[in-house]
Swiss-Prot record:
This is Ocellatin-PT4. Expressed by the skin glands. InterPro entries: Antimicrobial15, Frog_antimicrobial_propeptide, FSAP. Residues 1-22 form the signal peptide. One of its GO terms (cellular component) is extracellular region. Belongs to the frog skin active peptide (FSAP) family. Ocellatin subfamily. It is found in: Secreted. Has antibacterial activity against Gram-negative bacteria E.coli ATCC 25922 (MIC=80 uM), K.pneumoniae ATCC 700603 (MIC=310 uM) and S.choleraesuis ATCC 14028 (MIC=310 uM). Shows no hemolytic activity and no cytotoxicity. The modification Valine amide is found at V66. Disulfide bonds: none annotated. Residues 23-39 form a propeptide. It comes from the Eukaryota. It comes from Leptodactylus pustulatus.
């Protein structure tokens, strides 16, 4: 009976350790993904701002011709 208790304890302990390692890796992956999303948003904002300036400049040129 004591052998079964020790075996069960060992199995549960090893399961918890592996579970905590997986959770830690998952959190690191999510943090990396968040950083990538922020970089993508930053690049998109720059492109969007440049597009607005380009359109405003083009509209100004069109208005000068009219």
């Amino acid at each position: 009976m004591a052998f079964l208790k020790k075996s069960l304890f060992l199995v549960l302990f090893l399961g918890l350790v592996s579970l905590s390692i997986c959770d830690e890796e998952k959190r690191q992956d999510e943090d990396d993904d968040d950083d990538d999303d922020e970089e993508k948003r930053g690049v998109f904002d720059i492109i969007k701002g440049a597009g607005k300036q380009l359109i405003a400049h083009a509209m100004g040129k069109i208005a000068e011709k009219v």
